[in-house]
């Protein structure tokens, strides 16, 4: 008998089958086989093995295979192995029968398990018996195809002298780490890792240390040789099921496995298995196997001695994974208590001619060591992108369960406190070699090991249980705190809030429905397609794209949707320019045509007002309709400048105004307008206004019931890396000051972002507090589209340039899970792109308008003529009476009582001082139904103890607000008016921004902010520059906020002197605001009332007095309130009410503010009839006509001076010195200045120097 083996070994049956198909129909065979099969020449399987039907069995042999042919293990009980599925365990495979050697001139049944059960041959080609023999007679059958190949190769294998090494290896570490790996894969890209993957990779790694195990024996020219292949080609035994249900074994090679990392090894492994099952293996896949892996453990075999085929040096058998036999009857609890783990037996059957027993034994020992090694699993975890440390092999700790109970409780607390440090939240993973870990979160730190995983401990109600296995405790903790969401909440002081969050974070999260997943995908499609479209159509134009952070769109959508679910009234969005156009299009619903028109520069002149602004600063509003509900909600986006975070307090003020208009109160049903604030990571950590605005969150005068903060954390600030941008661990640490929960979310997981967004709204509704969502993502391009970020962050952008977008990765995840088909995904994206293309083409066809210089907005709002601001005397009396209408039993402070009594007296008899004139103005507005809001530092009492708008009970601390009595008329009916007066925090930037926003949100309210001293207004300079002075011109955003800035030179030093008149005058243009420096209480009264009644929405800047508050000359008579109106230019009373002769005047001193009283006093002292003093009460807009009319009354004037306290380069002169001669050349040509010298500081730091300087001004003014 000739039994020379085929170079294809046990794969010979497959070659035969391919050849048969090729002869019948070449197109039925994969083209990769054609070249081989054309030259294929079948040869007889045996000398003479005629079957019962007279046919002869033949086998195939190739002419000259390029490499040694594969020689897989024979199909026997010990060696046949089905390649494990990715999620299978060894014991899950079905048993396989043992093959017997072929015998001469007789045919035996192939020992295939399914063949034995079915009574059929192991191959499709086996002939049936010619006649059915008697029941007790033997049956003969010719072996063909696979069965014949098995028989022949088993016989040939007897020529190989083999020996076998056996080693039992602890499997517990492999089991536990596989659980961690597969759970991670399940949450992310899908798929599973099998034990065979791990063992196979360990074998390849061990071969690198023992390359002799990869050699094979060969005779060359009749001489024995040991052949050392260039690479390790690991042969995998793969069990295939034919169409008739019969199973056959092929052995295909993972080529060059020694050059692969674990991820590449898995990909090659899965490719081989997939192509084997799809019938796509080629001849190349069967050639060159150098060492084989077979896994009979899948049927429970503890260990086997598989046959070694020619061309290989060793075959490794994997046995079943079992507890030691003596413990297989023990309970799980007993096994856990004893620390007993499962074992897996590996065998190394090797060619004893070239490999010795010691080498084989050391080889298995190395595999053993690798499968328990920290470094081995570290490499695997890093390759799979698992950010956590693997389970470590450590000796069991013998401490008592009672002692370990406390350690488990400590571990739970540690995860709640520090779990976020281990969370997988960075989509870039720039430090791919670093595991997310912390010593407090390591079980080893707590004296626990992998042997404790299956032991039960007391957990005191954790996750709804009193006792839990440590494995289950860790599963809950890691799912809650260490996945794609990191949570910080233990800094919150209120136990109820912590408990509420714990229950939701540690509870099982429901997976989104398929419909919800498709909706999330649609939002990502919209976000990405919008940016891609703009990038394609408007190359190089700045738009500050959202690319890399597209998850912002579904996250914002979820916030708004959940607000609608709670039946709230409105969501107001404030955000910087990054991604703003995307938000306008896909969240607010701004028409694409309008956005594209702005890119085209196609502006309609009839709609253009003022200077305008770049497209990524503009605001808009729309209505959001729930996708999975019946509610809708208004959505608005506030305009913003490029000054990052400056919009924060503005938006909060706007929201508070809307809430006050709804007037639902501080109740469960209140705060139905929700602020949604977007931030950048660098700005959130770096801009002080963030902390100022956060500080407003829980204050009575400022709270809005909780803001949802969404940080678009692209891990860079223009070119500044996080290490240079913040000293804290997170950019969000500043938010801990107000006890806000903080969620760090991986931007590559849109489902996690949506879940957190909804939770944030629920928390806000429950506790009326801020919530912070830190969405970690990246910036696909530079700070703008023309920037190259690789110049400063080369490593980061090496990663970003090769990174797939979140839309693509999420789409693949949905397709991989079978939630949607590829066609559905492509159709959805194509539909959205089609919409954009259609609108783009429509915009291109729109009428083009010639670009013209922008027009002033000044003419858009004109003060009505003859506006009456006087009031009836009875109303003044009623306000005076209100100051003494204290509640019964109320104890007024002994120093305040005289003030209240004096006010009642002034209301009836006159000589009204400044503070009371202000309260009279506000009181009349309240009585007329106006909401008046007054705030500032020390505003309720007044910096100079002048206002006392709120009176405090000396004994109980209760409050009494006299003007609130004006909210009802004399008959007790509500007027609709309100008086809201608050002391602000020690802030200017946020406080002024808030009041500006409030005035925008409620145009009908009278909103006033008072500085402690006018000097401190420069702390709010960004708000003044970006909003107050230019908001109307840039965005058409109207405000009539009032700033009260105490101003005046009184020797208190450079920081308690100036409200910086010069700066406001420099900013003034286009009627953008009214700037006034009134000098009488009555004129101040009428100024405020005119501002309230004129219907003009423009800010009012008032420089208010300090020492003049108590100047006995600075008072007003009752009829000045009942008969007069605001007068922008004032003459001396001696000319308007007395007998002063204007014809005697040769010198006019123009001035403003408190210095008027000093000039008058000097004039009277010297009896200077030749000098007249004219006050300009309104500095801007300059009252040109009124000023000219006043000057014309003095026909003999030959000298005109502008007199001011301020230095020459400050105050009104830098503006007036230029504009007055231009505006009224006939009146002001040659006008001269009298002031302090030009100074870099507003004033001298010495009161004595101040007095000398002040005297010099007066001396010069009245010099002969």
From Swiss-Prot:
Signal peptide: none annotated. Acetyl-CoA binds at residues 1074, 1090, 1125, 1128, 1178, 1185-1186. Its EC number is 2.2.1.5, 4.1.1.71, 1.2.4.2, 2.3.1.61. SMART domains: Transket_pyr (SM00861). Residues 103-373 are annotated as: Succinyltransferase E2. It catalyses: glyoxylate + 2-oxoglutarate + H(+) = 2-hydroxy-3-oxoadipate + CO2; 2-oxoglutarate + H(+) = succinate semialdehyde + CO2; N(6)-[(R)-lipoyl]-L-lysyl-[protein] + 2-oxoglutarate + H(+) = N(6)-[(R)-S(8)-succinyldihydrolipoyl]-L-lysyl-[protein] + CO2; N(6)-[(R)-dihydrolipoyl]-L-lysyl-[protein] + succinyl-CoA = N(6)-[(R)-S(8)-succinyldihydrolipoyl]-L-lysyl-[protein] + CoA. Mg(2+) binds at residues 681, 714, 716. Residues 23-37 have a biased composition (Basic and acidic residues). Is a fusion protein with two major domains exhibiting structural features of an E1 and E2 protein, and a short sequence stretch of E1 localized at the N-terminus, which is connected by a linker region to the rest of the protein. This is Multifunctional 2-oxoglutarate metabolism enzyme. It comes from Mycobacterium sp. (strain JLS).
């Amino acid at each position: 008998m000739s039994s020379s083996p085929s170079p294809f070994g046990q794969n010979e049956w497959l070659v035969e089958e391919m050849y048969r198909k090729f002869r019948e129909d070449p197109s039925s065979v994969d083209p990769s086989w054609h070249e081989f099969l054309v030259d294929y020449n079948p040869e007889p399987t045996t000398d003479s093995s005629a079957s019962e039907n007279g046919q002869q069995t033949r086998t195939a042999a190739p002419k000259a295979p390029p490499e040694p042919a594969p020689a897989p293990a024979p199909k026997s009980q010990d060696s046949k192995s089905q390649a494990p599925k990715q999620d299978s365990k060894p014991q899950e495979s079905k048993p396989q029968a043992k093959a017997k050697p072929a015998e001469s001139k007789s045919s035996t049944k192939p020992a295939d398990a399914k063949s034995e059960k079915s009574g059929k041959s192991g191959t499709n080609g086996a002939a049936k018996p010619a006649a059915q023999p008697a029941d007790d007679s033997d049956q003969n059958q010719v072996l063909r195809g696979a069965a014949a190949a098995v028989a022949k190769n088993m016989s040939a294998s007897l020529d190989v002298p083999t020996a076998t090494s056996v080693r039992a290896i602890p499997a517990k570490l492999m089991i536990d780490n596989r659980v961690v790996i597969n759970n991670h894969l399940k949450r992310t890209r899908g798929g599973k890792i099998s034990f065979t993957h791990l063992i196979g990779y360990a074998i390849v790694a061990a071969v690198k240390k023992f390359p002799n195990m990869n050699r094979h024996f060969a005779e060359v020219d009749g001489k024995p040789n040991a052949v050392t292949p260039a690479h390790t080609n690991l042969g995998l035994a793969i069990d295939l099921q034919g169409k008739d249900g019969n199973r056959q074994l092929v052995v295909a090679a993972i080529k060059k496995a020694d050059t692969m990392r674990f991820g590449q090894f898995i990909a090659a492994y899965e490719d081989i298995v997939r192509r084997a099952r799809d019938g796509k293996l080629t001849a190349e896949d069967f050639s060159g196997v150098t060492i084989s892996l077979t896994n009979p453990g899948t049927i429970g075999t503890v260990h086997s001695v598989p046959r070694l085929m020619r061309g290989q040096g060793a075959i490794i058998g994997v046995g079943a994974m079992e507890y030691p036999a003596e413990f297989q009857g023990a309970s799980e609890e007993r096994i856990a208590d004893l620390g007993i783990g499962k074992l897996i037996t590996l065998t190394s059957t090797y060619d004893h001619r070239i490999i010795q027993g010691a080498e084989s034994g050391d080889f298995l020992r190395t595999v053993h060591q690798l499968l328990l090694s920290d470094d081995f699993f570290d490499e695997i975890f890093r390759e799979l992108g698992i950010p956590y440390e693997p389970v470590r092999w450590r000796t069991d700790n013998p401490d008592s369960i009672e002692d370990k109970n406390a350690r488990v409780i400590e571990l739970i607390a540690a995860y709640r406190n520090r779990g976020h440090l281990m969370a997988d939240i960075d989509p870039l993973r720039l430090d791919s070699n670093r595991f997310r870990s912390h010593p407090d979160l390591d079980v080893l730190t707590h004296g626990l090991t992998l042997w404790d995983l299956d032991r039960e401990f007391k957990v005191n109600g954790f996750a709804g249980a009193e006792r839990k296995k440590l494995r289950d405790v860790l599963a809950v903790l890691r799912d809650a705190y260490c996945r794609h969401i990191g949570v910080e909440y233990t800094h919150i002081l209120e136990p109820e809030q912590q408990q509420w969050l714990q229950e939701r974070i540690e509870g099982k999260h429901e997976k989104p429905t398929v419909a919800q997943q498709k909706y999330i995908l649609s939002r990502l499609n919209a976000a990405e397609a919008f940016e891609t479209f703009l990038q394609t159509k408007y190359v190089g134009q700045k738009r500050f794209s959202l690319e890399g952070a597209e998850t912002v769109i579904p996250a914002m959508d979820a916030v708004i949707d959940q607000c609608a679910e709670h039946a709230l009234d409105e969501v107001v969005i404030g955000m910087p320019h990054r991604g703003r156009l995307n938000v306008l299009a896909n969240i607010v619903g701004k028409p694409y045509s309008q956005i594209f028109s702005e890119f085209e520069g196609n502006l309609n002149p009839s709609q253009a007002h003022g200077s305008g602004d770049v497209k990524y600063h503009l605001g808009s509003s729309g209505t959001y309709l729930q996708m999975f509900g019946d509610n809708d909600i208004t959505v608005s986006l506030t305009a913003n400048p490029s000054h990052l975070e400056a919009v924060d307090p503005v938006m909060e003020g706007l929201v508070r105004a809307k809430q006050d208009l709804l007037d639902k109160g501080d109740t469960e049903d209140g705060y139905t307008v929700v602020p949604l604030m977007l931030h950048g990571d660098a700005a959130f950590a770096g801009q002080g206004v963030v902390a100022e605005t956060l500080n407003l969150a829980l204050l009575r005068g400022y709270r809005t019931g909780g803001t949802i903060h969404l940080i678009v954390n692209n891990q860079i600030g223009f070119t500044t890396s996080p290490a240079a941008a913040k000293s804290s661990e997170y950019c969000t640490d500043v938010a801990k000051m107000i006890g806000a929960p903080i969620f760090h979310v991986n931007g590559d997981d849109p489902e996690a972002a949506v879940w957190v967004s909804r939770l944030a709204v629920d928390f806000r509704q429950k506790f009326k507090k801020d919530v912070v969502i830190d969405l970690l993502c990246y910036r696909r391009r530079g700070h703008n589209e023309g920037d190259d970020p690789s110049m400063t962050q080369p490593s980061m952008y090496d990663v970003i340039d090769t990174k797939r977008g979140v839309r693509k990765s999420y789409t693949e995840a949905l397709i991989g899970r079978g939630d949607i088909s590829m066609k559905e995904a492509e159709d959805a994206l194509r539909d959205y792109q089609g919409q954009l293309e259609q609108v783009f083409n429509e915009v291109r066809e729109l009428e083009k308008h010639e670009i013209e210089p922008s027009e002033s907005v000044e003419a858009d709002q004109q003060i009505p003529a003859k506006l009456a601001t006087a009031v009836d005397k009875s109303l003044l009396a009623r306000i005076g009476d209100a100051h003494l209408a204290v509640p019964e039993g109320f104890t007024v402070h002994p120093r305040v009582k005289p003030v209240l009594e004096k006010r009642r007296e002034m209301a009836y008899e006159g000589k009204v001082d400044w503070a009371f004139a202000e309260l009279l103005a506000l009181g009349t507005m309240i009585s007329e139904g106006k909401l008046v809001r007054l705030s500032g530092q020390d505003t309720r009492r007044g910096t100079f103890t002048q206002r006392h708008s709120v009176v405090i009970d000396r004994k109980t601390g209760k409050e009494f607000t006299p003007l609130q009595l004006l909210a009802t008329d004399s008959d007790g009916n509500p007027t609709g008016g309100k008086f809201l007066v608050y002391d602000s925090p020690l802030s200017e930037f946020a406080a002024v921004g808030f009041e500006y926003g409030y005035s925008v949100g409620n145009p009908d309210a009278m909103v006033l902010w008072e500085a402690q001293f006018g000097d401190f207004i420069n702390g709010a300079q960004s708000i003044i520059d970006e909003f107050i002075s230019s908001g109307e011109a840039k965005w058409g955003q109207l405000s009539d906020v009032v700033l009260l800035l105490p101003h005046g030179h009184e020797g208190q030093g450079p920081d308690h002197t100036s409200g910086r008149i010069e700066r406001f005058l420099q900013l003034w243009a286009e009627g953008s605001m009214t700037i006034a420096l009134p000098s009488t209480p009555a004129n101040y009264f009428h100024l405020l009332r005119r501002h309230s009644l004129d219907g003009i929405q423009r800010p009012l800047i008032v420089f208010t007095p300090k020492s003049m508050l108590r100047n006995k000359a600075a008072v007003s008579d009752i009829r000045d309130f009942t008969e007069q109106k605001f007068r922008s230019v004032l003459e001396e009373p001696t000319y308007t009410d007395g007998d002063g002769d204007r014809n005697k005047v040769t010198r006019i001193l123009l001035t403003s503010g408190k210095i008027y009283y000093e000039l008058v006093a000097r004039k009277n002292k010297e009896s200077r009839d030749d000098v007249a003093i004219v006050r300009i009460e309104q500095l801007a807009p300059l009252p040109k006509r009124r000023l000219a009319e006043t000057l014309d009354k003095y026909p003999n004037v030959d000298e005109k001076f502008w007199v001011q306290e301020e230095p020459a380069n400050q105050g009104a002169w830098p503006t007036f010195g230029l504009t007055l001669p231009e505006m009224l050349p006939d009146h002001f040509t040659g006008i001269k200045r009298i002031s302090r010298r030009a100074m870099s500081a507003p004033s001298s730091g010495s009161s004595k120097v101040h007095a000398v300087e002040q005297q010099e001004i007066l001396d010069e003014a009245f010099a002969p």
